[in-house]
Amino acid sequence: MKHCFLILFTLIVFTVVWSLEENEEYPDEDEMIESFMDGYSYRGDDGTCILKGDHCHGTCDCCGWTTTCRKSKSAGGKICKSEGSSISAFNAIAKGVAAMKKAKCKHKSG
């Protein structure tokens, strides 16, 4: 019985370490969104659209892609930061809705 526990424990530790190393190879979700938004501007024609990374005072919304206006020490003020649930299913639903809204938005190359 003792050997079974040790084998099971070793497998669990190995699996956790392997999954952590695997995730480091891929860019962070926020980095992917940021790089995508660097290439395209989803700002409205009147320039009222506020995106992630922009300085803000209140809300951050652009064609349904909503983020939160939060204080940032590194940026020297408040900037729009992404927001999400720790439960990935909720994130997938929220991002799907945002993508549908964003698809209706006019976009132009930045």
From Swiss-Prot:
Species for this entry: Chilobrachys guangxiensis (Chinese earth tiger tarantula)
Subcellular location, principal: secreted
Keywords: Disulfide bond, Ion channel impairing toxin, Knottin, Secreted, Signal, Toxin
Gene Ontology MF terms in the entry: ion channel regulator activity; toxin activity
Entry GO CC: extracellular region
Cystine pairs: C49-C63, C56-C69, C60-C105, C62-C80
Transmembrane segments: none
Subcellular location: Secreted
Family: Belongs to the neurotoxin 03 (Tx2) family. 02 subfamily.
Residues cleaved off as propeptide: 20-43
UniProt function note: Probable ion channel inhibitor.
Entry note about domains: The presence of a 'disulfide through disulfide knot' structurally defines this protein as a knottin.
Signal peptide range in chain numbering: 1-19
Name of the protein: U32-theraphotoxin-Cg1a
